[in-house]
Every structure is written in structure tokens, then in C-alpha cells.
Amino acid sequence: MKKTVLVIVALVVAFGIYVRVAPFDLATWHTDPIEAPEKRKGGYKSTLVLESSNAQSALEQVVSVAAEWPRTRVLFGSPAEGRVSFVTRTRIWGFPDVTTVSAVAEGQSVTLTFYARQRFGGDDHGVNRGRVSAWIAQLQDQSSTSK
């Protein structure tokens, strides 16, 4: 019995370590959010149009907003590239969610496309939608106060 408990504890600890150190593949996670599926279980896709002609500047705003979000960091890309992928981890287990944002300038506006999805599990219980919605709300607030 004691041996079984130790094996179970070891497996739980190993899984906890794995979700924190497992590498991310650039080709899998830093994909174009415009081409991402509209519906994916545990995923969320949304767009925001800003009055700006500078895609890089718009993505710099996104990076600034994401930097304020707990346990979030840039995973791949940069505003200069036109696409940035962020990883946000859950508080206790450190499960990663990836949010990729692209910016496309068209005339005097920039369309930001957000695509958030979890790496492990089947359902994120609306966490990705909540995060993207909060980022969009903050960007809209910044946009309206800068006018």
C-alpha cells in the first residue's frame, strides 16, 4: 500500500514538472491567428479594430497589456514581426495557455486578431475567452482615452 501511494505521488510530481518544462514547438504554437479555426474546444478567437495605421505600435500596446497580466510572458515573436505569442500559466499547476496576436494595417486602421488555446486538457472553462476579452477591453479603454 505504501509503495502504491509513493508511486502515485511520484507520478503527480512528475506530471507537475512536465507541464512546466515541456518545450513549445514554434511551428505548432506561433501560427497565424487569422488562419486559426473559429471554433476549438478550449480555444477562443476574436478581433479588434483600432484606429491606427501602425501595426507594430498596435502590437506594442498588446505586449504592454499582456505584461501586466499575471504569469504571462512573450513566448515567440515580436511587434516588429507582426505577430506575438504569449504563454500564460495557471496559478497552482502552471498549466500553459498560449495566446497569439497578429496585427494587420489597412488604411487608417489596424486589425488585431487574437487566438488563445490551452496546451493540455479538453476544456479551459472560459479562461481563454476571459483573458482575451479583458485584454481587448483594456486596449479599447486605452484607445478611447488617447483620442
What are the functions of these language-model segments?
Residues T4-V7, F15-K147:
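Ser/Thr-rich, low-complexity intrinsically disordered terminal regions
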